Amino acid sequence: MAEVTAAQVKELRERTGAGMMDCKKALNEVGGNMDKAIDFLREKGLAAAAKKEGRIAAEGIVEAYIHGGGRIGVMLELNCETDFVANTDGFKQFARDIALQIAAAKPRYLAKADVPEEELEHEKNILRAQALNEGKPEKIVDKMVEGRISKFYKEVCLLEQEFVKDPDKTINDLVLEKTAKIGERIVIRRFTRYEMGEGIERREEDFAAEVMKEMNR
């Protein structure tokens, strides 16, 4: 039987919201088959997020966050299934936390799939050139690039970013946790971030660091 990889466990966790050990056990039980592992977790009542994937999340709120007298602004649409959940303090606080994350960490895209192919290829070409300039053997360069591109995703994709308040979790982890806890599908649909003077040459001011301090109070 093929050995279950960490990447498989991570993917199963992202798709189901189940714990790491439960995901590893499920994959071992079914010989590494992802679909069968999801079914295994559902049968055990452990795949909270997977059971809700097909449900429509059309309610929710638009959260607006303004920092530092109007120097940074964020608008975020966070969806759920019912207006009851949308009006709870917990859901509103979650939207606030995500808006603060966007203000502090400056993501440009929501998910990996949103990164334009030409930008991704451009980044890979730069990483490939860097590896070659470091004197790395050409036969391992592509593997190195794939490893380094994951860091790029963590910088530019909101769902891949480490949560500023708890770096052991990604934003995607938080969404899955909230889905399991609330019992409804939760979706970050879209966001926009503005920073005063963005694109204009001016003296350096780290507004994002200020937001991080506010989040950790």
Swiss-Prot record:
Keyword Amino-acid biosynthesis appears in the UniProt entry: no
Give the residues annotated as coiled coil: none
Quote the InterPro entries the UniProt record gives.
EF-Ts_dimer_sf (IPR036402), Transl_elong_EFTs/EF1B (IPR001816), Transl_elong_EFTs/EF1B_dimer (IPR014039), Transl_elong_Ts_CS (IPR018101), UBA-like_sf (IPR009060)
Region of interest called Involved in Mg(2+) ion dislocation from EF-Tu, as start-end residue ranges on this chain: 82-85
The primary site where this protein sits is: cytoplasm
What would you give as a GO molecular function for this chain, any one? Answer: translation elongation factor activity
Q: Where in the cell is it found?
A: Cytoplasm
- Cross-referenced Pfam families: EF_TS
Q: Which GO terms describe its cellular component?
A: cytoplasm
**Keywords attached to this entry:** Cytoplasm, Elongation factor, Protein biosynthesis
The role this protein plays is: Associates with the EF-Tu.GDP complex and induces the exchange of GDP to GTP. It remains bound to the aminoacyl-tRNA.EF-Tu.GTP complex up to the GTP hydrolysis stage on the ribosome.
Family annotation (PANTHER family): ELONGATION FACTOR TS, ELONGATION FACTOR TS, MITOCHONDRIAL
Q: What family does this chain come from, according to its entry?
A: Belongs to the EF-Ts family.
Q: Which HAMAP family match?
A: EF_Ts
Q: What is this protein called?
A: Elongation factor Ts
Gene that this polypeptide is encoded by: tsf
